[in-house]
Amino acid sequence: MTIHAQTPEPFSMSRAFTPRRLLLAVLLVALSALVLLGQSFRVFDRAWFAVQEWRHADAWKERSIWLPDYRVRIEAQPIEGLNDDVSALTFDPDRRTLFTVTNQPAQIIELSLQGKVLRTIPLTGFGDAEAIEYISRGVYVITDERQQRLVKVRLEDDTRFIDAADAQQLSLGIGLNGNKGFEGLAYDAEGKRLFVAKERDPVRIYEIHGFPHTQADKPFAVHVVDDPGRDKRLFVRDLSSLQFDEGTGHLLALSDESRLVVELDTDGEPVSTLSLLRGMHGLKRSVPQAEGVAMDDRGVLYLVSEPNLFYVFSKDEPAQP
């Protein structure tokens, strides 16, 4: 019996890469890219929350700020006389005005509720002022982003400048990450909690107890609390600003990259959102780079965007203050 050895067929590129296989490979690569992109932008988390928000709207609406009911009233109004990039926003209930900061040059700007500049106050000794928060009458906290420094300052009607060297300060070396440090502030006056937002990599919200030190008869003791579970539930790519609502005890978190304001309840669970994209909430154009959000005692939302744009959102057409 004669055995004939079979010669293996030579490898054929044309057989290995048939049009059908090439198409399948391209589809797999594209699908993988879409999944990664969706995870990066938290698309799936946001889609799932949108379903939950719709399903539980009736129940959640009664116990929350409920951002879906807000509509834009002033859109992309340039802040006249201010060409610098504004960062953060806070409402002063005593003066019934707003305050923001810029870092080049470093200064505080007081605004009317219609977005008009009332005064500017130069800052000295602040490397990268990124946020300002009202604490009590005449008392504010300013963040220095890169140094992760919190500075308590006094701001009177006749204040002409502020020097950080004269102020109470607190430095926190938590997850130092260059220009991705402390980006937003909010204050719970009843609970004496200062919320501090870390911009990204990773997104974090810290609760600081004991700063600013307001009780001279008690020792200066600072306690920092974080909530990794809450932070993971934040389906945003970054954090730009915070706002605490005394009425509900809820926290608003503003994201520039996600173009979104998220309302978090007392357990840190998202309960409602306000999209900053064109066509949403009456917006004719998307908010380009949202940097600060504040709420007044009537529930009106104010928002600033770089370079110098001013927005107002409310549930009803607000009366003139």
UniProtKB/Swiss-Prot annotation:
Gene source species: Pseudomonas aeruginosa (strain ATCC 15692 / DSM 22644 / CIP 104116 / JCM 14847 / LMG 12228 / 1C / PRS 101 / PAO1)
Disruption phenotype: Impairs growth at high Ca(2+) level, causing extended lag phase and decrease in growth rate. Raises the basal intracellular concentration of Ca(2+), and impairs recovery to the resting intracellular Ca(2+). Significantly alters the morphology of swarming colonies at elevated Ca(2+). Reduces pyocyanine production by 72%. Increases sensitivity to tobramycin at high Ca(2+). Reduces survival of the greater wax moth Galleria mellonella infection model, when in the presence of 10mM CaCl(2).
Record-annotated disulphide pairs: none
Top-level division of the source organism's lineage: Bacteria
Signal peptide annotation: 1-42
Intracellular or extracellular location(s): Cell inner membrane
UniProt cross-references to Pfam families, sorted A to Z: SdiA-regulated
Main location (coarse class): membrane
Cell inner membrane in keyword set: yes
Function recorded in the entry: Plays a role in intracellular Ca(2+) homeostasis. Involved in modulating Ca(2+)-induced swarming motility and pyocyanine production. Plays a role in regulating virulence in a Ca(2+)-dependent manner. Involved in cell protection against oxidative stress in the presence of elevated Ca(2+).
Family assignment from sequence similarity: Belongs to the YjiK family.
Residues spanning the membrane: none
One GO BP annotation of this record: pyocyanine biosynthetic process
UniProt KW Cell inner membrane keyword: yes
Induction of the gene: Up-regulated by Ca(2+), with the highest induction during the transition to the stationary phase of growth. Up-regulated by an unknown molecule secreted by P.aeruginosa during stationary phase, probably an autoinducer; induction is dependent upon one or more of the quorum-sensing synthases, LasL, RhlL and PqsA. Up-regulated by Fe(2+); acts synergistically with Ca(2+). Up-regulated by UV as a part of the oxidative stress response.
GO cellular component labels: plasma membrane
Protein's recorded name: Calcium-regulated beta-propeller protein CarP
Keywords: Cell inner membrane, Cell membrane, Membrane, Signal
Membrane topology: Peripheral membrane protein
Name of encoding gene: carP
InterPro entries: 6-blade_b-propeller_TolB-like (IPR011042), YjiK/CarP (IPR009722)
